[in-house]
């Protein structure tokens, strides 16, 4: 069954005019929700993501609670890595841990290929369930970017400085480019499968790429990103790029064949546009503001919206994920304010 959905988010992604500014929030499904915390008392991340009914419920929760204009699939960026031979364990209080980190070209050559229908059928089943039976807003599929995935694979887990990753990039360029190619192939196949299953847009998260300078990005990372976006673009859905602490790279992203440039709070929207970013923009509230009094939040959000609405193609989001400490009522109130304020301003 084909469901009728609210396409405001998709219109904004395409740079079209909308009646109001669409909004969704990174990590909108997660630790800030009491319902989610109850589920996590009984089930692990692995168990939730491997159970399509449970995962679909978690994914849809913020749509029902906050009235956001898009859902994003609840899963981890590490989800596809076991399929290519990477042993990943999500450890509480630490994050992803990999016991067999990449150290050589031989390690890279041992990596396999992903076959989503065989390797991650539960993810595709979750997407099908959501898009055929549950959602009246678009579902966003996603993947980690090659650099961020490689950083976990080389460091063996989270890092503060990514010294091992960048040292590998500089000292072993042949192995590095082989790894980028392997990961680009995986991301392309993975995203296409999500789209075929029903995702109406996709976002690529490059969480740690801000540690790389512009010159190195152009040489060591951008070619893989160009290939990913060019190949996935043939699927005909909007594509979003997001990184953290990477304001110096927004023009590099703008050059890629994508639709939406994601911004964090470090770069004002009007400054990004002054630098030549003329594609659709998503962002860019500092999630720390969500812990402030409502009067402070409202004034801050007005400023962001006033910048974003100056040209068509704007999606409100946070610059990073929702904190566990955020009151769900604040997010609900925020969405209502974004919709009402922007509708009034755009009608003038």
From Swiss-Prot:
The keyword Lyase applies. Disulfide bonds: none annotated. One of its GO terms (molecular function) is uroporphyrinogen decarboxylase activity. PROSITE patterns: UROD_1 (PS00906), UROD_2 (PS00907). Its EC number is 4.1.1.37. Keywords: Cytoplasm, Decarboxylase, Lyase, Porphyrin biosynthesis. Pfam families: URO-D. It is an enzyme of class 4 (lyase). Pathway: Porphyrin-containing compound metabolism; protoporphyrin-IX biosynthesis; coproporphyrinogen-III from 5-aminolevulinate: step 4/4. GO terms for biological process: protoporphyrinogen IX biosynthetic process. The record marks 76 as: Transition state stabilizer. InterPro entries: UROD/MetE-like_sf, Uroporphyrinogen_deCO2ase_HemE, Uroporphyrinogen_deCOase. One of its GO terms (cellular component) is cytosol. It comes from the Bacteria. Substrate binds at residues 27-31, 46, 76, 152, 207, 320. Catalyzes the decarboxylation of four acetate groups of uroporphyrinogen-III to yield coproporphyrinogen-III. Belongs to the uroporphyrinogen decarboxylase family. Homodimer. This is Uroporphyrinogen decarboxylase. It comes from Bacillus thuringiensis (strain Al Hakam).
């Amino acid at each position: 069954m084909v469901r009728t959905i609210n396409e405001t988010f998709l219109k904004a992604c395409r740079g079209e005019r909308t009646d109001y500014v669409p909004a969704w929030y990174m990590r909108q499904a997660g630790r800030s929700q009491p319902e989610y915390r109850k589920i996590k008392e009984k089930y692990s991340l692995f168990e939730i993501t491997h159970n399509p009914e449970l995962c679909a419920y978690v994914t849809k929760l913020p749509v029902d609670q906050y009235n956001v204009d898009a859902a994003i699939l609840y899963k981890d960026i590490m989800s596809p890595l076991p399929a290519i031979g990477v042993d990943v364990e999500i450890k509480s209080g630490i994050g992803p841990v990999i016991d067999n980190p990449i150290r050589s070209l031989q390690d890279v050559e041992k990596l396999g290929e992903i076959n989503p229908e065989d390797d991650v059928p539960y993810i595709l089943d979750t997407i099908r369930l959501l898009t055929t039976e549950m959602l009246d807003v678009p579902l966003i599929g996603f993947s980690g970017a090659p650099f961020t995935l490689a950083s976990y694979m080389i460091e063996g887990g989270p890092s503060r400085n990514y010294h091992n990753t960048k040292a590998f990039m500089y000292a072993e360029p042949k192995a590095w480019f082989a790894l980028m190619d392997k990961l680009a192939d995986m991301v392309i196949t993975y995203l296409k499968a999500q789209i075929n299953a029903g995702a109406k847009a996709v976002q690529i998260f490059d969480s740690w790429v801000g540690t790389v300078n512009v010159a190195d990005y152009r040489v060591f990372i951008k070619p893989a990103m160009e290939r990913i976006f060019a190949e996935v673009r043939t699927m005909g859905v909007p594509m979003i790029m997001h990184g953290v602490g990477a304001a110096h790279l927004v023009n590099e992203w703008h050059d890629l064949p994508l639709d939406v440039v994601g911004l964090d709070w470090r770069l004002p929207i009007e400054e990004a546009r002054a630098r030549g970013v003329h594609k659709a923009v998503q962002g860019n509230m500092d999630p720390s503001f969500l812990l402030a009094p409502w009067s402070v939040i409202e004034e801050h959000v007005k400023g962001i919206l006033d910048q974003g609405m100056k040209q068509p193609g704007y999606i409100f989001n946070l610059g990073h994920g929702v904190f566990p400490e955020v009151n769900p009522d604040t997010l609900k109130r925020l969405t209502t304010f974004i919709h009402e304020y922007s509708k009034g301003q755009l009608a003038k």
